[in-house]
Amino acid sequence: MLKNKILTTTLSVSLLAPLANPLLENAKAANDTEDIGKGSDIEIIKRTEDKTSNKWGVTQNIQFDFVKDKKYNKDALILKMQGFISSRTTYYNYKKTNHVKAMRWPFQYNIGLKTNDKYVSLINYLPKNKIESTNVSQILGYNIGGNFQSAPSLGGNGSFNYSKSISYTQQNYVSEVEQQNSKSVLWGVKANSFATESGQKSAFDSDLFVGYKPHSKDPRDYFVPDSELPPLVQSGFNPSFIATVSHEKGSSDTSEFEITYGRNMDVTHAIKRSTHYGNSYLDGHRVHNAFVNRNYTVKYEVNWKTHEIKVKGQN
């Protein structure tokens, strides 16, 4: 369902406000306009768009925060990309064989933003660098005059006129920026390593997730139970990413942005084999990136004057 949430409330904030409380931020997200600074130097105008694709198993929840700063010679927009990407993990018989079962699972989740507008530039984004921690929390702050800065965590020291936080969980996965330039940024949240009953295993281990029941007819039984699968494999991923862009004032009234959520899928085969003595066991075989860029892309049109958001297309 498409939701276009229009703003109704006006708040006043002191010239140097402390870092925002993330719980309050999430509660009021996209439901207000904030006048920040003495004499209303900055106005934050908020919009939210929700788009869901059952075909791709993806929901995009995008917050658009327009920064109207009298002391900054450009328009600025903070895009917070949230929602859900289903894992789409499935189990099946490989080519109708009786002795080979397959598990298709997400090795990588993809999150990206792109624009082709010559008057728009990417100026900041979160997260940056490679992050291996299970819980990711960072802040993007804004100070009067067009100064965007990031803080390492929700407990970071410092003050901003306005701030936006990200927070997500990536157990057994790592986040890193795969591509970035003045018009786009692409993140990959990739499988890393897993604690199993037989010890720590790399995400590339051929026996990863292979189970212990070679005599079952159910493909699911050839692999470890749900209790041994991390959330990003069993159910899916809740992204929380930020990109900030600038726009040349007086140039174009509208700009288009493509936001992409998706996954790259690996396939693990569990093959029933027998020893010289007739005992059965399961042997793993891996196909890395068997299905790549299984992505849902939505094209949003941003109006810099009216602050309206329109959905212009989707795949």
From Swiss-Prot:
GO terms for biological process: cytolysis in another organism. Keywords: Cytolysis, Hemolysis, Signal, Toxin, Virulence. It comes from the Bacteria. SUPFAM superfamilies: Leukocidin-like (SSF56959). Residues 1-29 form the signal peptide. GO terms for molecular function: toxin activity. It holds the Pfam family Leukocidin. GO terms for cellular component: extracellular region. Toxicity requires sequential binding and synergistic association of a class S and a class F component which form heterooligomeric complexes. HlgC (class S) associates with HlgB (class F) thus forming an CB toxin. Toxin that seems to act by forming pores in the membrane of the cell. Has a hemolytic and a leucotoxic activity. Belongs to the aerolysin family. This is Gamma-hemolysin component C.
